[in-house]
Amino acid sequence: MLTRKQHQLLLYIDDHLRRTGYSPSFDEMKDALELRSKSGIHRLISALEERGFLRRHHHRARALEVLRLPHMGTEAPAATGTGTAFVPAVLNQGQTGLEGAFSEASVANDRQTVSIPLYGRIAAGLPIEAMQDDSDRIDVPVSLLGTGEHYALTVAGDSMIEAGILDGDIAIIRRRETAENGQIIVALIDEQEVTLKKLRRRGSMIALEAANRDYETRIFPAERVHIQGRLVALFRQY
């Protein structure tokens, strides 16, 4: 299991490679993780190498290679930290309740739940319309939601698998109209298509990034994209 800092650094390196084509500098990694010295970055990279997530090309500058990303719910820590990178809190939903994602003590504390609407399927591949139907609902632990209004959507497709978001997962969304770069959002395109993607602002344009190398980034004028909410957690049924 990766530590939170190891996981955060791995996602940061992977994102930087996707955006720029080369590795971030040690200073950039230090600043991104809010560490005081570069020695902490060296230790994190060594640990990621030992666990088979990262490879260093020692005779080249800024040459890190991401070999694999962790499978959420097994390698990744629960999402309670800060920063814009999404680390899913995956709750295994069984017939007897919620299991596996929290310790026994925290599950016991999460018996108090709130019912939120489940709005059909959202594409994690090509965008599709979301079904705005309040007839289906899902019970979610209150402590998982925090403040604000929430709703749920079922993920369809595989374009976000490298962020640990799988086909059939139930995405828990905090309703809001703004988000920071790097956050995973529900985006409404041209008032008719809805998709779950990572947000990147590029001047007057908005890029919607997949977390799967087989999918291209889609770029739109900002006025064509409206943010419908931000991903805060996942439910997964086995």
UniProtKB/Swiss-Prot annotation:
One of its GO terms (molecular function) is serine-type endopeptidase activity. Its EC number is 3.4.21.88. It is an enzyme of class 3 (hydrolase). InterPro entries: LexA, LexA-like, LexA/Signal_pep-like_sf, LexA_DNA-bd_dom, LexA_repressor, Peptidase_S24_LexA, Peptidase_S24_S26A/B/C, WH-like_DNA-bd_sf. CDD domains: S24_LexA-like. Pfam families: LexA_DNA_bind, Peptidase_S24. It comes from the Bacteria. GO terms for biological process: DNA repair; DNA replication; negative regulation of DNA-templated transcription; proteolysis; SOS response. The active site is at 159 (for autocatalytic cleavage activity), 197 (for autocatalytic cleavage activity). Residues 26-46 bind DNA. The record marks 124-125 as: Cleavage. Keywords: Autocatalytic cleavage, DNA damage, DNA repair, DNA replication, DNA-binding, Hydrolase, Repressor, SOS response, Transcription, Transcription regulation. It catalyses: Hydrolysis of Ala-|-Gly bond in repressor LexA. Represses a number of genes involved in the response to DNA damage (SOS response), including recA and lexA. In the presence of single-stranded DNA, RecA interacts with LexA causing an autocatalytic cleavage which disrupts the DNA-binding part of LexA, leading to derepression of the SOS regulon and eventually DNA repair. PANTHER family: LEXA REPRESSOR, LEXA REPRESSOR-RELATED. Homodimer. Belongs to the peptidase S24 family. This is LexA repressor. It comes from Gluconobacter oxydans (strain 621H) (Gluconobacter suboxydans). The gene is lexA.
